[in-house]
Amino acid sequence: ERFPGVPRRLQVVYRGDFTILDDFGHNEASLRAVFQTITGMDYRRLVIVNYLKGTRGIEANEITARHIVRAARKARLARVISTRSDSHVSRKNIVQDEEEEAFTAIIAGAGIPIVNTRELPAAISLGLESVGPGDLLLLLGPSGMDAGADLALRLLHQPPREKQLLPPALLASG
């Protein structure tokens, strides 16, 4: 039986004139894997839409920003769009001003163009407007980005992602 992959773990959600890749980016190992994978892909430029990690402290957002900066040149990074996803997260995941500021300071300090948004739909729209033929759009971040791929697909007039279930053999082994 073919394993469909794990949703939001280096998931290709759209392939057309450009590609959309979605990843939860939940820890440093995950971020390393994302950027290592991306640098091996064939694309023209990279645009990242990143959900800031709300109520996880400044350090969590600084870690993500540092991984982005380290990968920027090799990954041909064109711009970063960050979002608080205010209307798409629970109270416990609300991004604090200092979390956004910490992330932004590192990205901007490296000379990478960055735009901050409060809402996920605005960030996704801006991400789609920022890509061209051959580009890669990376949707990155935990729960506040969960709806990101489906929003992008809707804006591209594409059907939503199929809900992926784990194969029965994996469920039985747990």
Q: Model segments located where?
A:
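ATP-dependent carboxylate-amine ligase
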Residues: 2-174
